[in-house]
UniProtKB/Swiss-Prot annotation:
Keyword Acyltransferase: no
Active site positions: H353 (proton acceptor)
Annotated residues for binding of Mg(2+): E76, H256, H258
The name this protein goes by in its record: Homocitrate synthase, mitochondrial
Family that this chain belongs to: Belongs to the alpha-IPM synthase/homocitrate synthase family. Homocitrate synthase LYS20/LYS21 subfamily.
Pathway: Amino-acid biosynthesis; L-lysine biosynthesis via AAA pathway; L-alpha-aminoadipate from 2-oxoglutarate: step 1/5
Gene name, Swiss-Prot/TrEMBL: lys1
Species name: Penicillium rubens (strain ATCC 28089 / DSM 1075 / NRRL 1951 / Wisconsin 54-1255) (Penicillium chrysogenum)
Amino acid sequence: MVLLPPSLPVCQLKVTAPEFPSNFYLDGDHSGFVGIETRQNPHPSASRNPYGHDAGVTDFLSNVSRFQIIESTLREGEQFANAFFDTAKKIEIAKALDDFGVDYIELTSPCASEQSRADCEAICKLGLKAKILTHIRCHMDDARIAVETGVDGVDVVIGTSSYLREHSHGKDMTYIKNAAIEVIEFVKSKGIEIRFSSEDSFRSDLVDLLSIYSAVDKVGVNRVGIADTVGCASPRQVYELVRVLRGVVGCDIETHFHNDTGCAIANAFCALEAGATHIDTSVLGIGERNGITPLGGLMARMMVADREYVKSKYKLEKLKEIEDLVAEAVEVNIPFNNYITGFCAFTHKAGIHAKAILNNPSTYEIINPADFGMSRYVHFASRLTGWNAIKSRAQQLKLEMTDTQYKECTAKIKAMADIRPIAVDDADSIIRAYHRNLKSGENKPLLDLTAEEQAAFAAKEKELLEAQAAGLPV
């Protein structure tokens, strides 16, 4: 039997104009940026990638349209170097994640400390829609404590690679299998959901992995877990392992990917394509070292895979609020290029891009920012701007000119931007002054400039106008 390559369904697919304020790299503030509204373009639905081909067998295995999220900010995220969540903050984060719509919320082991146990019990009493899990070692002492906290499920883990068996717990595979079965049967006897996961799965022997997973599947584990504990796996390795495992076990498959080599999102997506059912995430990807699959990044990827499923299940407009909450709690700034919520995620600057975006946003966007309650921006105050962006901005300022005049005004803005950085206010002043000169027939200066700037501006303006007259792109 030949398994055809997977088809990757794509999503379907609102503008605004910036100058970068001084705090641009600090807090993502858009003050000083001006919105440029474009016509709303229809986003035709597409259930599969038009550039792919029908791959029925792989589609049968794929869970990209029916995945579940195990949100681990309050477990993996608590292992982030900067993290300290008191009880009130944990409850606030748990409620926010529940409101967003995650399927599960995973908490630090109640065995870690007395406060961890008290926090676990407190969150279990909140009555959230999401199932509450706790993460423990594959040991009966931990299991006995975990089942008394009120959790809906227990996530059990033990290292299976030769590295961890030799240098961590010192147990062999026979011990691991027997311990796993004992813990699983005990937890299930309490009517609680249980997952068994190997640790460092991708550096474990495949025969050992399949043997232990098959054994726990037979005793009724709810999920088996694959963990790329050191972030070494590639998407291809993930797909192949999950596909093989899918043929061995009948239970659900959970996956946990660290981001040490930058593959956590791609690995999560490939795992779903191969038949995994659950993905571990954390807000902003926080966790040990480089962290794990970020919730926002996974949402971005899955919106491209099945927009309607994601929109129907998760309150996407809550994403930024959650990320701001966690970022403040762990005292980090949200990166300027963060998936979806980063300052630049939907900012367009190049003239060619701006023209197309103004006509139809899907030309340079695969995700509609409005789906996440975000805005797009066209940055027109730069040497890279194009006359279509200046025309759109002038019309927003209710200043009508001919296309030739818009182009001449654009040349003046580009000339000034070649001399020094310009702000939105500078660009607006040039547009307004140019329009006033047209109406009055005068030739007053467009901006207050030093003598040196005036000379440089005149030279640049002449150069650009000559190039424009010659039909060259400017």
